[in-house]
Amino acid sequence: MNNNTNGEIIIPQEYLEKSECLFKELKELNINFKEVKHGLAATIKDLLEMNLENSTNILKNLFLKDKKKNYFLICTLNNKTVDLKNLSNILKTNNLRFVDENNLNNILNIQPGCLSPLAIKNDKENIVKLYFDEEIKNMQEVIIHPLHNYSSLYIKTQDVIKFCESFNHAPEYVQIKEDTTSKARVDKKEDVQEEMAKNEELQNNNNNNKNNSNSNNNNNNNNNHIKDTILKGKLLSNNEVEDNKSKDSNILGITSKKIENFSDWYTQVIVKSELIEYYDISGCYILRPAAYYIWECVQAFFNKEIKKLNVENSYFPLFVTKNKLEKEKNHIEGFSPEVAWVTKYGDSNLPEEIAIRPTSETIMYSVFPKWIRSYRDLPLKLNQWNTVVRWEFKQPTPFIRTREFLWQEGHTAHKNEEEAVKLVFDILDLYRRWYEEYLAVPIIKGIKSEGEKFGGANFTSTAEAFISENGRAIQAATSHYLGTNFAKMFKIEFEDENEVKQYVHQTSWGCTTRSIGIMIMTHGDDKGLVLPPNVSKYKVVIVPIFYKTTDENAIHSYCKDIEKILKNAQINCVYDDRASYSPGYKFNHWELRGIPIRIEVGPKDLQNNSCVIVRRDNNEKCNVKKESVLLETQQMLVDIHKNLFLKAKKKLDDSIVQVTSFSEVMNALNKKKMVLAPWCEDIATEEEIKKETQRLSLNQTNSETTLSGAMKPLCIPLDQPPMPPNMKCFWSGKPAKRWCLFGRSY
């Protein structure tokens, strides 16, 4: 059991973060529960030995797959021995076996020994079928893990069902009989869990003989290495445990590798670098000052540029009536599942439901007819910086997919199509600059397919980014040509020069705080955040290095001189003169937060009238004379931005595979690539391609680490390769119209 010197249960931080997020989601659904902390319990046997009250209510949970890679989460009573062959017959499948640890983590984002029905919330692709033993129906309360095995929840059975249903996973019920004739088949992964539990106990006993608090923290950091070793069939000795702990003593740093566990890496980076703080409403997050500073930087750039296009800032209300919101049917269909409604004030019901804006087209366009009467009133160009709410129940990801987010949304009205379309692409190019010049992120400009375009638009232009570590594209920004669709709905007309009534041609365009998440995913590394200089609050951190015989006052004065030189040149920097922390601690502290440049000053630097400059992006060091510090720093900031962009651009380019037949697609997708394919652009093929790639993803048998998820059209790139004569569509065989970029996406 993991205890500190006071006898308190110590739960690893990464597990605490998971359970805190879960608890917020449960409370949001008005679900009550009682948590009992008991220390590590990797198996049912361990949990039963904890002597919990009503232990017969502890559920046994099995994560299984069949030969065709259909996935099943089975929940039954803890005293039942399950025969997988018999269970295969019940589920009308064959060859059921336990899912390996990699896929357990990839699909349900959970570690062995931590499984519970609540983990179904992490099934982002909706590929897992949830089954409850029929006997669970008769249980008033169950005992399950809160996504980790250091505590258990006492929770009403109906509330567990309610929670699963809220994530679109209503359980099906099956009759699971006790296998009394023979032991059920047990996968080796259960043996691995037993070994992991033994090894954890061995470590904890050893830790308790030394320094409980510090040793246990180091033990948590080294957990991934321990698991890897056990999975290879080796149980660590006491000495080996101590050796491994000493290799990873920085408990404040990032403990997951970006390439190995991207989701956990991302969560650690945004929290430990002090960008995000979790909130008690799922999908809503606190943007801390470092994150909001990034938003202010891109906001200042965009404001300056749109004003050159004669766009004016304004603000429209947060609320919209149901009648107004539903006026444009095609438009609202895309948002209706996500709209949050206000139905009460105090204890009274509102006479009419009021929606919280998911976007502002219908809010703004209802007043446009009052402002636009003549061609002299055009063009009307407005922008607003605000928040919107989209109450979706997909797995939230800070910055990337949230229920409330900051954005800018622009809306314009023009007298003709030519003028409106020009603005659409002018704005799209500003989004390119937003990403390239400030976030050092390359994007692909293109046009959305008919099935992916904005509801109510004639066409949608898009900026697409790509995260090579997990093989997923992200829509970075969009700019829409709405034609006269909304003008006809809201009767936005003007009298032209010939006194003829015409409908206005409209545009709308937006970019969100998602851009910050894309930047983090693109540049971050195993040390933490990597900030492009143009959005880093502090460009430079100055760290003094003292020894016992050091003249601290002299070094302090020297560092202050460098600080003054940089600040006088408008380079914001911070002098870290904290006396209670070592230089190494300070290095890690600022590397985690992504500060572009570190300047080190020690006794030798003082003697040589120099300093050491270290780049965050590539860890290169150089010795620089004091008189050259300003010029070197200025050039280095430029070089860092350029290097970050070029490195990301190469990753993006290397992630595109050109294909001409569908047989080439899955190989590319499973290598975390996008595919550029000749396409007929038939809207019916979009859903066909999604379904087939989803099916093939689940049925892959050649690799246990195959990625899952459907492929969809991301965009038709504006920069088109030459199309050979008579080229056929890679899917339908019909004549191809253009090259289209396909891939998995967020």
Swiss-Prot record:
SMART domains: ProRS-C_1
Feature: compositional bias, Basic and acidic residues: 181-201
Positions bound to ATP: 390-394, 401-405, 475-477, 512-514
Catalysed reactions listed for this entry: tRNA(Pro) + L-proline + ATP = L-prolyl-tRNA(Pro) + AMP + diphosphate
Modes of activity regulation: Inhibited by the quinazolinone-based compound febrifugine from the Chinese plant Dichroa febrifuga which is used to treat malaria-associated fever. Also inhibited by febrifugine derivatives such as halofuginone.
Database matches in InterPro entries: aa-tRNA-synt_IIb, aa-tRNA-synth_II, aa-tRNA-synth_II/BPL/LPL, Anticodon-bd, Anticodon-bd_dom_sf, Pro-tRNA-ligase_IIa, Pro-tRNA-ligase_IIa_arc-type, Pro-tRNA_ligase_II_C
Gene3D superfamilies in the cross-refs: Anticodon-binding domain, Bira Bifunctional Protein, Domain 2, C-terminal domain of ProRS, YbaK/aminoacyl-tRNA synthetase-associated domain
Residue sites binding L-proline per the record: 390, 480
Major location (coarse): cytoplasm
Gene Ontology MF terms in the entry: Ala-tRNA(Pro) deacylase activity; ATP binding; proline-tRNA ligase activity
Biological process terms in GO annotation: prolyl-tRNA aminoacylation; tRNA aminoacylation for protein translation
Enzyme class: ligase
Biased composition (Low complexity): 204-224
One cellular-component annotation, GO: aminoacyl-tRNA synthetase multienzyme complex
SUPFAM superfamilies: C-terminal domain of ProRS, Class II aaRS ABD-related, Class II aaRS and biotin synthetases, YbaK/ProRS associated domain
Domain of life of the native organism: Eukaryota
Region named Disordered: 181-226
Domain-level remarks: Consists of four domains: the N-terminal editing domain, the N-terminal catalytic domain, the anticodon-binding domain and the C-terminal extension. The first domain (about residues 1-163) is required for editing of incorrectly charged tRNA. When it is deleted the enzyme shows pronounced misacylation of tRNA(Pro) with alanine.
Purpose of the protein: Catalyzes the attachment of proline to tRNA(Pro) in a two-step reaction: proline is first activated by ATP to form Pro-AMP and then transferred to the acceptor end of tRNA(Pro). Functions in trans to edit the amino acid moiety from incorrectly charged Ala-tRNA(Pro). Has no activity on correctly charged Pro-tRNA(Pro) or Ala-tRNA(Ala).
Subunit description: Homodimer.
UniProt family annotation: Belongs to the class-II aminoacyl-tRNA synthetase family. ProS type 3 subfamily.
Name of this chain's protein: Proline--tRNA ligase
Gene: proRS
